[in-house]
């Protein structure tokens, strides 16, 4: 022990390790939200409600995984919300217009979202502009393109139904099916979420690439000096966001058959909220993937809990904002305490 | 230089107090404000329930964005009917399809006794309404989605067919001899708005143009409309598609300084004032209050007596054409938020 700090030394090592975890704040918040709604909302504890809450959390969580990785890497993606809609629109229109098996649309959509992610990363590396500006640009462009292209091709603002096309059923099975386990209805998005969560956590904590993510987010210049390919790391992180958007976009398409072109915008901030509640620092270099899952879960519990509790949903956004502030404060506090202790 | 400290005389504080009272008294507005609103609320009939049925629970899930005056009126109607019918009324809304679907699912989880849903997103609601049906919850669709309603197993639909409403507006404009109409769409990509404009175009029998403005940025919308009016002096009629947009349209017409008539869909305080003063020619109303009120009331009738208005055929709440003749009566109802 190099720093003599009586306060910290007094604590057992296990507790100290726990306090240093980025997820701690969100774990406390998640438990608190759960307890509140379990007490005030009778339907909240029903198994069927749990399925609804998990589903709501998964539709945020699928994107919160790559978005939190990106934030640990020190960057934003404001286009993350509309890319989801782009993914769904691309898949639907490609399949419909070419009368192709729906898998063709699904694959074209994957290529498209990865290309958008690559574009964001490439622009960032090339121009050295802040990612806030670069992705704000792609966000606006995609919002316009979603509407413009859809209208030009289908004549209306939503896509035509592809429910009767070949391959729809198998795609639906992959992206939008549901299984009932002991009364609990689990949608496909929940499996995708858990899968992405496991992969994201493993990459971040157990691989060299994970170390690179922390390095480029903590101090890009220092990382470059020790040989970390900074631009390439960030581009891969943007590709990850593209992949997440593809998964969620396919889910939207195959569970609802048609896609509205104007949707998705605004959700990028929800993903960032989930990541921040989960302990990601907005300046990068610190955070966790598991925390983003807790953030998404808090979001799912809060958004549906308010309905189950029969509260006035007009206040939902207020509640969410207060949660965000509290989580950020708690994280800052915990981090300060942890940094005071020995490393 | 010496500074003299302000030393209040003995009379200072009493004078202050008298002044404060005087200002407070004189400062009371004899018109408008909260007091007037409370008086109106009292005047609007409320009262307890008039029935002896058990306390049923009815949920309404709409595609409305937050803080929309139109949906507030729908809600008021539903709450009024709920009070009368001894019903617990639950309201929730989300403009995004997947979130609205989740809200409907949450209502089903709560085991509500009846469900009112808007189908602005059509196909997307098929699955979840199937679940409502499987759970034995009676569903009535309101406002939008008439074409899907029966297909998804709803008991009936209460709303206005937007194409019909557009045609009614077109006919009225033709009757009024309007020559060149500018239809202002304020939500790019809203199917209902497109239908209103194209319906009006089909019956207007005049020059007809459509322009798109950004409805969530009113100064921008106003500037866009007045720029259009200035650049094309042959336009003699502006057709807006909502109450708030009509107010913006009126400002734009004033900017343009020309004898342009504004006609609109839906109502609002400014629209009624405009009808009264003559700056608004007519308004096509779909009676949002009725959509909420009838929705709840029809659920009650169905559960109480298995009744269904129109035998399950869509029930129209509009188009109702309102002109200067109705303005006086409407003013009061708009002010209390039920029109």
Where does each model-flagged region fall?
Chain B
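Structural motif
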Residues: 88-111, 210-232, 246-248
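Extracytoplasmic "Venus flytrap"
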Residues: 43-81, 85, 90-102, 119-122, ...
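C-terminal motif of bacterial Sec signal peptides marking the signal peptidase cleavage site
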Residues: 23-27
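Hydrophobic alpha-helical
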Residues: 117-133, 200, 214-273
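An alpha-beta-alpha
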Residues: 58-60, 65, 78, 167-212, ...
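Hydrophobic alpha-helical segments within soluble ligand-binding/sensing domains
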Residues: 100, 156-181, 220-222, 267-271, ...
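Flexible loop/hinge segments that line or gate small-molecule binding clefts
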Residues: 123-164, 268-276, 280-281, 329-331
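Hinge/cleft segment of the Venus flytrap/periplasmic-binding protein
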Residues: 29, 37-54, 203-204, 290-339
């Amino acid at each position: 022990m190099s720093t003599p700090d009586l306060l910290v030394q007094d604590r057992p090592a296990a507790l100290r390790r726990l306090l240093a975890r980025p997820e701690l704040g969100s774990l406390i918040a998640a438990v608190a939200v759960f307890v509140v709604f379990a007490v005030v909302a009778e339907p909240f504890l029903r198994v069927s409600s749990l399925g609804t809450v998990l589903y709501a959390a998964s539709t945020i969580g699928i994107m919160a995984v790559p978005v939190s990785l990106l934030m640990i890497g020190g960057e934003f993606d404001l286009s993350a919300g509309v890319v989801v809609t782009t993914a769904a629109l691309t898949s639907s229109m490609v399949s419909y217009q070419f009368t192709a098996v729906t898998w063709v649309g699904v694959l074209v959509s994957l290529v498209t979202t990865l290309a958008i992610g690559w574009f964001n990363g490439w622009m960032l590396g090339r121009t050295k502009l802040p990612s806030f500006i670069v992705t704000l640009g792609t966000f606006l462009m995609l919002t316009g393109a979603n509407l413009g292209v859809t209208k030009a091709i289908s004549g209306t603002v939503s896509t035509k139904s592809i429910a009767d096309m070949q391959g729809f059923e198998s795609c639906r099975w992959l992206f939008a099916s549901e299984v009932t386990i002991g009364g609990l209805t689990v949608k496909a998005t929940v499996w995708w979420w858990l899968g992405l969560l496991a992969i994201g956590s493993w990459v971040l904590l157990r691989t060299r690439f994970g170390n690179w993510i922390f390095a480029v987010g903590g101090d890009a210049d220092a990382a470059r000096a020790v040989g970390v390919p900074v631009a390439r790391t960030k581009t891969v992180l943007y590709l990850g966001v593209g992949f997440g958007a593809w998964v969620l976009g396919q889910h939207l398409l195959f569970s609802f058959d048609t896609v509205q072109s104007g949707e998705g915008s605004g959700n990028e901030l929800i993903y960032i909220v989930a990541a921040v509640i989960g302990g990601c620092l907005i300046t990068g270099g610190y955070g966790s993937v598991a925390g983003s899952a807790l953030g998404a879960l808090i979001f799912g519990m809060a958004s549906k809990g308010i309905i189950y509790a029969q509260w006035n949903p007009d206040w939902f956004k207020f509640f969410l904002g207060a949660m965000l502030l509290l989580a950020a404060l708690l994280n800052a506090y915990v981090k300060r305490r942890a940094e005071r202790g020995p490393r | 230089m010496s500074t003299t400290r302000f030393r209040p005389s003995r009379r200072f504080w009493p004078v202050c107090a008298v002044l404060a009272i005087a200002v407070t008294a004189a400062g009371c507005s004899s018109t408008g404000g909260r007091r007037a609103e409370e008086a109106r609320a009292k005047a609007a009939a409320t009262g307890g329930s008039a029935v002896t049925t058990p306390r049923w629970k009815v949920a309404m899930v709409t595609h409305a964005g937050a803080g929309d005056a139109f949906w507030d009126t729908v809600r008021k109607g539903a709450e009024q009917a709920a009070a009368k019918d001894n019903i617990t009324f639950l309201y929730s809304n989300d403009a995004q399809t997947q979130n609205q679907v989740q809200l409907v699912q949450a209502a089903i989880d709560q085991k509500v006794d009846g469900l009112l849903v808007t189908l602005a997103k059509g196909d997307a609601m098929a699955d979840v309404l199937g679940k409502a049906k499987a759970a034995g919850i009676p569903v009535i669709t309101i406002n939008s989605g008439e074409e899907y309603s029966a297909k998804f197993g709803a008991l009936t639909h209460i709303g206005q067919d937007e194409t019909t409403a557009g045609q009614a507006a077109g006919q009225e404009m033709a009757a009024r001899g309007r020559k060149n109409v500018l239809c202002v769409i304020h939500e790019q990509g809203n199917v209902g708005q497109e239908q209103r404009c194209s319906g009006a175009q089909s019956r207007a029998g005049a020059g007809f143009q459509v322009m798109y403005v950004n409805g969530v940025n009113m100064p921008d919308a106003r500037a866009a409309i007045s720029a259009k009016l200035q650049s094309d002096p042959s336009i003699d009629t502006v057709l807006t598609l909502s109450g708030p947009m009509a107010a913006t349209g009126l400002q734009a017409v004033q900017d343009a300084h020309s004898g342009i008539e504004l006609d609109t869909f839906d109502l609002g305080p400014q629209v009624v004032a405009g009808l009264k003063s003559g700056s608004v020619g007519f308004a096509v109303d779909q009676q949002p209050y009725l959509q909420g009120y009838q929705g709840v009331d029809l659920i009650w009738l169905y559960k109480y007596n298995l009744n269904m208005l129109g035998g399950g055929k869509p029930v129209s709440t509009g188009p109702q054409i309102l002109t200067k003749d109705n303005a006086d009566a409407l003013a009061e109802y708009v002010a209390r938020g039920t029109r």
